Amino acid sequence: MDWLLLANRVLDGADITDDEALAILNCPDDELLLLLQGAYRIRKTYYGNKVKLNMIMNAKSGLCPENCGYCSQSSISTAPIPTYKMVNKETILQGAKRAYEAKIGTYCIVASGRGPSDKEIDIVVSAVKEIKETYGLKVCACLGILKPEQALRLKEAGVDRYNHNINTSKEHHPHITTSHTYDDRVRTVETVKEAGMSPCSGVIIGMKETKQDVIAMARSLKALDADSIPVNFLHAIDGTPLEGTKELNPRYCLKVLALFRYINPTKEIRISGGREVNLRSLQPLGLYAANSIFVGDYLTTAGQEKHADFQMLEDLGFDIDFAPASYAR
């Protein structure tokens, strides 16, 4: 396969075929750098050498009634994680201050559970208004399944983006959870779009899905027109049904990132949870396909030290995309 020719076709507006998508996932290791060169050509066209940085605030941990097999916060998990109800506004603001001082442009407020209560929405709305006035950061919320009126309140408060992952393909979804459907997740993404927020939706790779499932995920997100696509790589946690699952290697993870770039050329693609344990020493190469990362810790697992991420970006010669609103103090 001529990967640069394929990249040029994508830049000319063509969609890759299923055979070409499968060829990306089956790319011989000795062609991997050529594949990434093609992905980088696409990435650079739309994003240059800039990298978007995101930080997570785990605003509510554990206590979730859902039965997602990958998640340490689910009702069926026995993982020893911190559990607490929604934090107060001041705690959310403290996290935003840390993000601003670290030059992290997007602050992500995440809460466990099937969906937020109106009281939890009240806390987030109050915090977001002050974050916007004080720091001018972009704010992403991830609170579960939303009612239309809740989505409108978040939009009016200043939430820029709302995350609700599809996680896997529609066909594989029943193998991951039975407490909600794939269509439930899609409806929430549509609710977000209807409210005027930017839709963020992504996947988790390494949950015993097939390569055809991975291709279906990338195409589904294209059809949903998700502006931001977090690509997680399973960090199997003891005490979850997927405990001990180890299907991934760093080279395959890079091929997955390339696939998402070839299929979703104009979108923000973020290397998300599991980056450190799955890409390992090949983490820097991932940014030739992706243009965004999380900095700091994830929900219940530790991330790489911030200074190591900033050093990685400096070594790559990439620039941090940090442009808070001009009215921030």
From Swiss-Prot:
GO terms for molecular function: 2 iron, 2 sulfur cluster binding; 4 iron, 4 sulfur cluster binding; biotin synthase activity; iron ion binding. It is an enzyme of class 2 (transferase). [4Fe-4S] cluster binds at residues 64, 68, 71. Pfam families: BATS, Radical_SAM. InterPro entries: Aldolase_TIM, BATS_dom, Biotin_synth/BioAB, Biotin_synthase, Elp3/MiaA/NifB-like_rSAM, rSAM. The keyword Metal-binding applies. Its cofactor is [4Fe-4S] cluster; [2Fe-2S] cluster. [2Fe-2S] cluster binds at residues 108, 140, 200, 270. Its EC number is 2.8.1.6. It catalyses: (4R,5S)-dethiobiotin + (sulfur carrier)-SH + 2 reduced [2Fe-2S]-[ferredoxin] + 2 S-adenosyl-L-methionine = (sulfur carrier)-H + biotin + 2 5'-deoxyadenosine + 2 L-methionine + 2 oxidized [2Fe-2S]-[ferredoxin]. Binds 1 [4Fe-4S] cluster. The cluster is coordinated with 3 cysteines and an exchangeable S-adenosyl-L-methionine. Pathway: Cofactor biosynthesis; biotin biosynthesis; biotin from 7,8-diaminononanoate: step 2/2. GO terms for biological process: biotin biosynthetic process. Keywords: 2Fe-2S, 4Fe-4S, Biotin biosynthesis, Iron, Iron-sulfur, Metal-binding, S-adenosyl-L-methionine, Transferase. Residues 46-275 form the Radical SAM core domain. It comes from the Bacteria. Belongs to the radical SAM superfamily. Biotin synthase family. Catalyzes the conversion of dethiobiotin (DTB) to biotin by the insertion of a sulfur atom into dethiobiotin via a radical-based mechanism. Homodimer. This is Biotin synthase. The gene is bioB.
